[in-house]
């Protein structure tokens, strides 16, 4: 009987790294592979990965951005320690391949894999490559990317996303029977985006007879943002305010348009369902979210509003100049940019390059 192949996944820190990696892991599990995970104890993967039935091991590593001089001076020691911890785990687990999908854990894990002779397959989720992935690309056996701008010669495969997003009805079917108020979904991510939470209620007050709104405000913000809607005179039966949304596929499919940040996973989830967006990119020196948003905006599937330019006037102007015919055209373009076989393609590359 042939021995089962094993993949070590290195991904952590944010949902943008962890969820695409889970999608690939689940695909390979169906192909008979064993999966183990390398993460850190204090980030989201520590709770999330075991919930999906995947065993996880931990190394000690954290980012250096914003740290003091003491942390910077100790960084070489901390990195060497993390590499040795990862090497010990790799020698014990004996994976046939390692998949790096971002987060602090990927750096030491990738170096340790190279030292152990295990092939490293890298996937960059964003339109701009993170520093860790830039370094790892020099030792990786294969480099894959979601968008065509991160690496000059890497294969573009899209971002692996949950399959339930692709099972939603196509835009033509969803929009066919829609009449009445435009459906606006506001999503700030798991933490809520403060700028959206503070701007949208004022916009809603000026379009109360034109919009139906679902607003996900993040943990601990429902009471405050509900009060803000009430203060602006925008609170009504057509406004639903929640901390979190459990079924994002259904929420995206319900919406005529989404107002949100433009993390890589969000952009690819919207494309998977085929839902237009108004993106408000998070401000970052490398313009990562802006370039993610351009992937859909450049084909007419989304609008971009820079955070410095965001106010109620801008949102009112955008929404009053969009009708369902235009929104359907945007939705169709978004769907055309989706990558339904991203998880499968990443898995195929792993299988092709495994020891």
UniProtKB/Swiss-Prot annotation:
Keyword Transferase: yes
Biological processes per GO annotation: carbohydrate metabolic process; cell division; cell wall organization; lipid glycosylation; peptidoglycan biosynthetic process; regulation of cell shape
Main location per the UniProt record: membrane
Molecular functions (GO terms): UDP-N-acetyl-D-glucosamine:N-acetylmuramoyl-L-alanyl-D-glutamyl-meso-2,6-diaminopimelyl-D-alanyl-D-alanine-diphosphoundecaprenol 4-beta-N-acetylglucosaminlytransferase activity; undecaprenyldiphospho-muramoylpentapeptide beta-N-acetylglucosaminyltransferase activity
Keyword Cell cycle among UniProt keywords: yes
Subcellular localization, as worded in the UniProt entry: Cell inner membrane
Record's protein name: UDP-N-acetylglucosamine--N-acetylmuramyl-(pentapeptide) pyrophosphoryl-undecaprenol N-acetylglucosamine transferase
